Amino acid sequence: MKIVLVSRIDEADALRYTASLARELEGLGHEVALEEGTAAHLGEGGISFEEIDGDLVVVVGGDGSVLLTVHQMKKQVPVLGINWGEVGFLADLEPDEAGTFFAAHTEGFHIERRMRVSLSVNGVPLGDALNEGLVVTDRPAKMLRFGVYVDGTPAERFRADGLLVSTPTGSTAYAMSAGGPIVDPQIEGFLLVPLAPYMLSSRPHLISTGRNLEITLETEKPAHLVIDGQSTFELEKEATLTVKKSDQPALFVHTGKPFFEKVNHKLRNL
């Protein structure tokens, strides 16, 4: 197999581990390449995220590193995360588990698809999110007013500090911290979670991906859309955000660990 390695570059131990893993994988007969940022810190040549086109991408880092990799890849390639972060909901393996895992899976892996949301503003596509799109004011202590329309029907209007448009995968990220539910990633839906809403009646909504979902920014205050913490876009007043299911899901290696077992383990070890 052709395997591309990506490491967080702010941790020397992570880089050393990645270099060691590269040698181990080559010893198992795999063709190994390094992402160019990782390669530069190891004194090697590498390839850009946009050029990644192999059988597997191994990310040594936390959820942020995995999100960056998925966000930057031009073509979605199966990802396996090795946790070198705080929680690592998107990183299934611990560093000491990787060697055994690869030795036991020399012929291939079971791949799990995770839906992403495609976000556009006023008809202009801005990108896909694996975790969430965040609409937030750029002026602290100023609230925004939102209108939510499902199949053209007004479903909710509320004032809040911001709004999260999350995937089921993202339900264990910012959305969970904001009071949203944990959603089984096998469910395909759009999770809307208001941030500090003015009215207690403004609750999270889980909406089928089969419906047409639009969110209007009913305010003249400046706001921004942040996609997976990676890309930021300024929103015009009275902008309309259209949310659709992306036709390019993220691909992850399924390591055999049940989702709710992972959630229970990681939340108890925060």
UniProtKB/Swiss-Prot annotation:
Instruction: Report residues binding NAD(+).
Output: 63-64, 131-132, 142, 159, 161, 172-177, 196, 230
Origin: domain of life: Archaea
Q: What is its main location?
A: cytoplasm
A single Gene Ontology MF term assigned here is:
NAD+ kinase activity
Question: Which species is this record about?
Answer: Methanoculleus marisnigri (strain ATCC 35101 / DSM 1498 / JR1)
What cofactor does this chain's UniProt record say it requires? a divalent metal cation
Q: What is its EC number?
A: 2.7.1.23
Q: Report the family membership.
A: Belongs to the NAD kinase family.
Protein known as: NAD kinase
Residues of the active site are 63 (proton acceptor)
Q: Which PANTHER family match?
A: BIFUNCTIONAL NADP PHOSPHATASE_NAD KINASE (PTHR20275:SF43), NAD KINASE (PTHR20275)
Top enzyme category: transferase
What gene name is listed for this protein?
Answer: nadK
An example GO CC term for this entry is: cytoplasm
Q: Which UniProt keywords apply?
A: ATP-binding, Cytoplasm, Kinase, NAD, NADP, Nucleotide-binding, Transferase
Its function, per the record, reads: Involved in the regulation of the intracellular balance of NAD and NADP, and is a key enzyme in the biosynthesis of NADP. Catalyzes specifically the phosphorylation on 2'-hydroxyl of the adenosine moiety of NAD to yield NADP.
Q: Which InterPro entries does the record associate with it?
A: ATP-NAD_kinase_N, ATP-NAD_kinase_PpnK-typ_C, NAD/diacylglycerol_kinase_sf, NADK
Subcellular location field: Cytoplasm
Instruction: Please provide an example of a Pfam family that matches this protein in its UniProt record.
Output: NAD_kinase
Q: Which reaction does it catalyse?
A: NAD(+) + ATP = ADP + NADP(+) + H(+)
SUPFAM superfamilies reported in the protein's UniProt record: NAD kinase/diacylglycerol kinase-like (SSF111331)
